[in-house]
């Protein structure tokens, strides 16, 4: 590792962004840089153009000669793109000879991937040899190609290769100038109007005159993090180079000093101590050069060597005294100084993976300034992002979660004490768009924070917003867009999930890492350009990229007021919290003052009898999303029912659930009860029958011995309000939870629920007799079991479209997703985001489901007489399953990671065998495909309708085909079909599936 820098060389003015300091930092810059002069004629706008291909008509080659360079990350369109090839050609023709001196090429900057050609050749007038050969840089902005001076009627640019992760390379613009264009001319052309206003010039003058209270700015120099999702920046985007720099703005463009050279490493972020003397930063020293998309490297669950993971370092402001603070084969990044002298950061040392993807999920930790006493503060089962410290001393950070809601939103803002107590929502836990708020920093002389508003998919760049939650924890009025050229609410209804940010419906912005200065001023990085901005969108660009790298994380070098040093809430401070993040097994206490607050008048006092305490179980093992096909060459995406792998439900809950138990609610609505510490838990308010009147669709967590209270069952935000030690007087000891009869473990449908149907329902509803088309037997099927398939999947796109990862967005497309006629469960696939806004009591689960009414009423016959009396305990099991959002598997572990959903068991040759047999023996009655259920019995295949219906009744079949097709089970074709299941049975004997009793003994 190097930490001695070479002397910085003067910036090259070969590109627009490198030119910005020289063009813009002049104190009295005129509205137009007269030294640049007018541009010569752009001959490309008069040419006839053609290309080797186009992605579609919206990306035709004519758009690349419009004379207008598309703004970065605008709505797609306005540029030319190839269709799925890394090379191609672009041709310009004129009817009369023209004098062409220079070509200027702009890469496809509207694409988040920065799809850029690499090597090129330029041929003039059908000459045999190219006139020019060269290589483009993978960057935004103009890149000039000088041409030999001669009359031309045709220019052909052969693009010989592209940079990695450029699936559809092309050009935002191709200009052909009659005279060489200077760098100054190109730069001036790109100066946006908001940097030429008197207010922008005054803003620059404030900085240069020192009236903002500082002269130097700390910066991180690195390549841009071009990544596939906001939660993968610890895995993707590593490209070596850069370091820590101190920039001094001056009239002539300023002085740039390197204080730490990252060498072959890369620094993501840095934070300056409150006294301005020390820097803590995250750096990865080397290893695999990973970039977008992660599908190319997803066989890597976590890098095994320390150097391939981000680690935290501390160094003095002059670059001396470097010390590494964290170690090990895990990522530690996003550090920020705490008022007590410690450091907060995120780490993925405790194994947890995104349920809908393949990467680890770092969460919030803290340590002393020297790296000692590292301990986990957050119990998130997904990812935490970009912590910083509020003026009141709490840590503010971004939290990604999806408790019974879609995965794309919501990455909202949360606050917590530096000791891990007092977790509270800050803003956005029910905001669908923007999908992500991150990089939050407190406004020093005002309320609220500045943050980046961005997407779920794509980079961590977007627009900049000021958020004041006093206007409402989810209210749009709380958000002020400080970059009005960016549509922070961009979303195409019917075309993609809210907050998703796919190419045609996302926020297009280049801003990241804002730092409020006070006086409605802030520093920010825009595409690697450091800007000084105000809240009225005036901007002054200070420093542009150099050496193919930009500048990020700007911070003024000056002492800062120290935020409040918090002592935190009541907790057991003798509890030893392991540095590796393991759960200690301790307990905490929750006190509910009045559970009816927020539920009245829809819920009457006295209705709620218990509170269920439920844990979201993390995905603790890595599962590759792409696996080898078992039926031929190549790879396949194994995600099913949304993005589930391993599969847990039919498009409902992503995570398995663990019910810790039930707490009794007093007549006045109060309750005090113990809960497990250090795990993500949420609550269900249950009526006297055990049905969930209201549910949390978020989670909280507590430290050992912590006491946390809430006013009631909030309708507007499901978060807990911390109660300071000494403010809370309990009437007695907190009650222990009543544990469920099946034990405290992952909720398994076959274990907990299926027995109810076996005892009370399958005598009538079985493979032979299916009143109403309902079979409630427990035979294992390809994904689940029969009763789960019938109750959960019937009437939904999960019957046949289980490979679909989503659906069009909005409640108006509920018909596309469908809903079970038996259970009102919550969709969580992409496109179903709006159901997070449907929060009325009894809207979901058992109170809204036909199945619950059948069980309550005894399933009356045509005379109104009950057919069955289901005991209270059995009914409660089924109600709870519905209110947990119908999980099937009680674990995210799998013995079959290579299968679809890491679960599916289906003979490879079953379909072909059935088709061949049917073509000979069933064609008289059945044209085309045989009638089949959308599920297939696996362990008892003889009970599938395609074997029962054609089998003679005398041989044990139903003979629903009329005349027997198979006179006996000895029929060769019957046996041939049956034998296709033999390999599956052998596999399951060797490696039981997670819904089999033998699973625990052999789980890998």
Task: List the predicted regions and their residue ranges.
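Disordered, acidic Ser/Thr/Pro-rich linker "stalks" and the adjacent N-terminal cap
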Residues: 37-100, 108-120, 135-137, 147-149, ...
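Residue-level detector of Asp-centered blade-edge/turn motifs that repeat once per structural unit
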Residues: 212, 274-275, 338-340, 390-391, ...
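Short beta-strand-plus-loop segments that form exposed binding edges in beta-rich domains
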Residues: 158-165
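Multi-bladed beta-propeller domains
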Residues: 252-266, 317-331, 368-382, 417-436, ...
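Beta-propeller blade signature
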Residues: 243-248, 308-318, 360-370, 410-421, ...
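Aromatic- and Gly/Pro-enriched helix-to-coil junctions and flexible linker segments
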Residues: 34, 180-214, 239, 600, ...
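Short, conserved, GDST-rich strand-edge loop motifs in beta-rich repeat architectures
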Residues: 219-239, 282-308, 345-360, 397-411, ...
């Amino acid at each position: 590792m190097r930490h001695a820098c070479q002397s910085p060389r003067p910036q090259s003015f070969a590109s627009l962004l490198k030119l910005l300091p020289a063009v813009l930092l002049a104190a009295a810059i005129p509205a137009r840089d007269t030294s640049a002069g007018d541009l010569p004629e752009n001959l490309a706008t008069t040419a006839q153009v053609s290309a080797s291909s186009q992605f579609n008509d919206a990306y035709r080659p004519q758009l690349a000669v419009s004379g207008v360079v598309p703004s970065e990350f605008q709505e797609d369109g306005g540029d030319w793109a190839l269709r799925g090839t890394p090379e191609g050609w672009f041709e310009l023709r004129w009817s009369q000879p023209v004098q062409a001196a220079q070509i200027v090429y702009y890469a496809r900057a509207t694409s988040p991937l920065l799809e850029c050609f690499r090597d090129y050749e330029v041929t003039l007038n059908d000459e045999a040899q190219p006139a020019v050969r060269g290589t483009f840089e993978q960057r935004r902005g103009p890149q000039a190609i000088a041409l030999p001076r001669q009359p031309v009627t045709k220019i052909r640019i052969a693009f010989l290769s592209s940079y990695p992760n450029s699936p559809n390379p092309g050009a935002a613009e191709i200009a052909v100038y009659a005279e060489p264009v200077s760098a100054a001319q190109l730069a001036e052309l790109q100066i946006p109007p908001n940097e030429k206003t008197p207010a922008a010039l005054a803003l620059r003058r404030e900085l240069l005159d020192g009236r903002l209270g500082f002269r130097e700015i700390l910066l991180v120099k690195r390549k841009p993090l071009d990544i596939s999702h906001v939660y993968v920046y610890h895995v993707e985007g590593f490209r070596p180079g850069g370091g820590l720099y101190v920039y001094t703005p001056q009239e002539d463009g300023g002085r740039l000093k390197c204080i730490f050279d990252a060498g072959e490493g890369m620094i993501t972020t840095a934070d300056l101590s409150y006294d301005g003397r020390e820097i803590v930063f995250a750096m990865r020293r080397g290893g695999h050069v990973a970039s977008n998309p992660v599908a190319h490297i997803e066989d890597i669950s976590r890098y095994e060597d320390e150097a391939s993971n981000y680690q935290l370092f501390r160094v003095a402001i002059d670059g001396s005294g470097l010390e590494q603070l964290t170690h090990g084969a895990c990522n530690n990044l996003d550090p920020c100084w705490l008022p007590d002298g410690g450091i907060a950061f995120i780490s993925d040392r405790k194994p947890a993976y995104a349920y809908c993807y393949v990467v680890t999920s770092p969460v919030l930790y803290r340590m002393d300034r020297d790296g000692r006493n590292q301990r986990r503060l957050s119990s998130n089962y997904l990812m935490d992002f970009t912590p910083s410290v509020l003026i009141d001393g709490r840590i503010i950070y971004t939290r990604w979660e999806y408790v019974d809601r879609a995965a794309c939103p919501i990455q909202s803002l949360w606050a917590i004490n530096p000791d891990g107590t007092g977790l509270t929502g800050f803003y956005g836990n029910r905001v669908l768009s923007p999908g992500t708020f991150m990089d939050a920093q407190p406004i020093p002389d005002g309320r609220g924070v500045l943050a980046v508003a961005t997407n779920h998919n794509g980079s961590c760049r977007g627009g900049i917003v000021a958020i004041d939650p006093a206007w409402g924890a989810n209210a749009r009025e709380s958000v002020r867009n400080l970059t009005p050229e960016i549509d922070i609410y961009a979303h195409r209804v019917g075309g993609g999930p809210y907050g998703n940010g796919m190419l045609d419906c996302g926020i297009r912005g280049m801003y990241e890492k804002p730092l409020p200065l006070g006086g409605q001023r802030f520093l920010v990085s825009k595409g690697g350009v450091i800007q000084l901005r105000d809240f009225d969108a005036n901007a002054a660009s200070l420093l542009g990229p150099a050496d193919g790298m930009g500048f990020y994380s700007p911070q003024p070098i000056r002492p800062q007021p120290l935020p409040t040093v918090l002592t935190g809430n009541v907790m057991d401070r003798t509890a030893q919290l392991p540095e590796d993040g393991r759960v200690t097994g301790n307990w905490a206490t929750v006190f509910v003052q009045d559970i009816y607050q927020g539920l009245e008048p829809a819920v009457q006092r006295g209705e709620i009898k218990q509170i269920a305490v439920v844990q979201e179980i993390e995905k603790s093992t890595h599962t590759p999303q792409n696996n080898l096909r078992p039926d031929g060459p190549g790879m396949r995406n194994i995600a099913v029912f949304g993005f589930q792998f391993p599969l847990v439900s039919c498009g409902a809950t992503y995570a398995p659930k663990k019910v810790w138990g039930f707490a009794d609610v007093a007549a006045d609505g109060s309750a005090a009860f113990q809960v497990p510490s250090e795990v993500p838990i949420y609550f269900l308010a249950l009526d006297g029958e055990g049905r969930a009147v209201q549910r949390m669709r978020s989670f909280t967590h507590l430290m050992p011995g912590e006491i946390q209270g809430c006013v009631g069952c909030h309708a507007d935000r499901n978060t807990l309000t911390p109660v300071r030690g000494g403010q809370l007087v309990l009437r007695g000891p907190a009650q222990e939870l009543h544990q469920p009869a099946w034990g405290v473990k992952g909720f398994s449908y076959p274990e907990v629920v299926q027995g109810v149907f076996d005892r009370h329902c399958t005598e009538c509803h079985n493979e032979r007799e299916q009143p109403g088309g309902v079979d409630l037997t427990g035979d294992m099927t390809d994904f689940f079991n029969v009763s789960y398939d019938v109750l959960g999947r019937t009437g939904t796109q999960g019957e046949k479209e289980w490979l679909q990862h989503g659906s069009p967005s909005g409640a108006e497309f509920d018909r596309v997703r469908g809903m079970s006629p038996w259970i009102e469960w919550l969709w969580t696939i992409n496109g179903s985001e709006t159901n997070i806004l449907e929060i009325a009591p009894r809207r979901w689960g058992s109170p809204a489901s036909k199945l619950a009414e059948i069980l309550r009423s005894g399933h009356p016959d045509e005379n109104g007489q009950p057919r069955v009396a289901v005991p209270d305990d059995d009914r409660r099991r089924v109600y709870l399953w519905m209110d947990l959002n119908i999980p099937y598997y009680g674990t995210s572990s799998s013995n079959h990671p290579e299968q679809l959903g890491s679960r599916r068991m289906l003979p490879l040759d079953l379909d072909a065998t059935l088709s061949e047999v049917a073509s000979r023996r069933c064609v008289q009655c059945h044209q085309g495909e045989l009638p089949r259920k959308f599920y297939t019995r696996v362990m008892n295949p003889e009970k599938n309708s395609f074997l029962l219906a054609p089998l003679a009744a005398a041989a044990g079949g139903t003979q629903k085909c009329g005349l027997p097709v198979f006179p006996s089970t000895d029929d060769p074709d019957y046996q041939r079909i049956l034998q296709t299941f033999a390999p599956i049975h052998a596999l399951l004997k060797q490696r039981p599936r997670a819904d089999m009793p033998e699973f625990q003994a052999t789980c890998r």
